[in-house]
Amino acid sequence: AFCRCGKGIMETVDGKVTFGVVVGTRGFFNPRLAVESRQELLAKLDALGYSYVILPEDATAHQAVETRADAKKCAALFQEQRDRIDGVVVVLPNFGDELGIVETLHRARLDVPVLVQACKDRLDAVDVAGRRDAFCGKLSVCNNLYQYGIPFTDTRDHTCDIESDAFSADLDFFARVCRVVRGLRRARIGAIGARPAAFQTVRFSEKLLQDSGITVVPVDLSEIIGRARQLDDRAKSVQQKLSEIRHYGTIPDRIDPQNVLKQAKLSVVIDDWMTENELDASAIQCWTSVQNNYGCAACLSMSLMGEKHKPSACEVDVVGAVSMLALLLASGQVPGFLDWNNNYADKADTCACTHCSNFPRSFMGREVEIAELDILGESLGRKNCFGAVKGHVAAGPMTYFRMSTDDRRGTIKAYLGEGEFTDEPFDMDGGIAVCRIERLRELMGHLCQNGFEHHVAMTRTHCAGVLQEAIAKYLGWDLYRHG
C-alpha cells in the first residue's frame, strides 16, 4: 500500500466558510446601534450559511469590541479557534474604536483575509441618538490596518446596510477569497511520474511552492501501473469505475472492452493514491510511458477526478494543477486545462485552445465522446491510447488563470483575465475551446516576454476579481490582470 502522509487540510469547495466577527463601537455613540448591528449581522450569516466565531454577548459592554481589554478577549478567542477561522469580518455600526479593532487583529495574528464594512447613516437619523459616522470611522480603522501591515478587503460601497443585497454580495466575494487563500496555503498536489523529457516548459520549483504553503507529493509512475495490473477485474471498485465510465460519455463500438477495463483500473489506483495521501489536485505523466508500458491514456482518469473537484493537469505540470485548483476554489466551477494552441483565421481577438483531452464533462458543458488519442494514437497505436475525452466546449463566460514559479527571480508570478467561449467551429480532434479575449495579441505578448508556459487553466464563469484579491493582496504573488 502507498504510505499515508499528514492530514489533508484543504477546505472542500462546497463546505462552510467560518468568519471571525468583530463588531466595533465607540463610547459616545448610541450603544443600541452596536447591539442591533450585531443581531442583524449574525442573522444574515446564519441565513447565508456561514459559520462564525464571536465573543459572547456578555463578554463586553454593548456586545462589541471597543477597549484594549475587549481586544485581548476577542484575540484570545480567535487564537483558540484559529484552525476554524477562514477570514475576519469587521463591522462598524458607528465610528468604532480603531485601537480596539486593530489590537484584536494584531494580537490574534491569524494571517487570514479581513473584510471591513461600515454601516450607512440615514438622513432622518443623524441626531445624537441615531448618527453613526461609520463613513468616517472606516477611514480611521483602515488607516490603522495599513500602519500595522494588515491587508484587508473593502466592500463594494464605502458604506452599506448589513441587511442589504450589496453586503450579501460582498460576503460572497469575501468567502471566495478566503477559500482561495486557505485552500492554496494548505494545498497538497500529487506529481505522478516524471515530466516529458521534451517539455522543459513545465519545469518548476517545489521550494517556491512550499514557501507559499503548497506541498508536492511525488510518486513513480511504475508504482501506479504496477498496482493497476494487480487489481482483480471483478473487484467491486473496478466494476463501480467501469459503470461510472460508461455513464460519463459515449464510447464508440470499435473500442475493445479490455481497453475500457484498463482505464478503470488505472483510475481506481490513482483515486486510491490521491485519497491515501489526502491530495487536492494532481499532475500526471500522461505520455508516452503509460501508453507504452500499460496500454491506455490517462486523460479519462484525469477528467473523472476533475469532475469530482480534484483537478488534474497534463504532462506533470504541477503549477498548472495549482492554477486549476485556484480557479476551482474561486468559482466553485470545474476547471479545464488547455494549450494556447491556434490562431482563429484572421480574428485578432479569437484563438483555439485545445488538449487531447482531459476536460471534465462539466467544463465541456455538453455530452462528451470517450475514444482514442489522435496524434499519439498514430505513433503509439490506437489500441494503446483509449481514454481521450472529446468534444467542443459550449459557449459561455470564461476566466483564465496561470501561475508559474520564476526561479530566476525567486518569485511566483501569475496572469489572469476573463473572456468567453464561443460556438464557432474548429475542425480539430480532441477537446476544443474557441475563445474570445479582448486584446489577445497583447496578452500573448505578455506571456512570451515573461516566460509563461503554453498551458492555461480555465473555468466556465467570471471570477477574476476574486483571484486578483486573493493572489495579489493576500498571497503576495506578482500578478498581471489582463483587460
Locations of regions flagged by a protein language model:
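Cap/lid and interdomain-hinge subdomains that line or gate substrate/regulatory clefts
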Residues: 14-20, 52-53, 122-240, 246-255
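Extended hydrophobic packing segments that form well-structured cores
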Residues: 39, 380-483
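N-terminal beta-loop-helix "entrance" segment that forms/cooperates
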Residues: 52-77, 226-235
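Glycine-rich, highly charged phosphate/nucleotide-binding loops
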Residues: 63-83, 97, 262-269
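Periplasmic-binding protein-like
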Residues: 84-94, 115-117, 279-285
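Short, acidic/small-residue loops that bind anionic groups at enzyme active sites
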Residues: 102-131, 139-144, 303-316
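Long, internal scaffold/assembly segments composed of regular secondary structure
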Residues: 240-330
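C-terminal catalytic subdomain
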Residues: 306-423
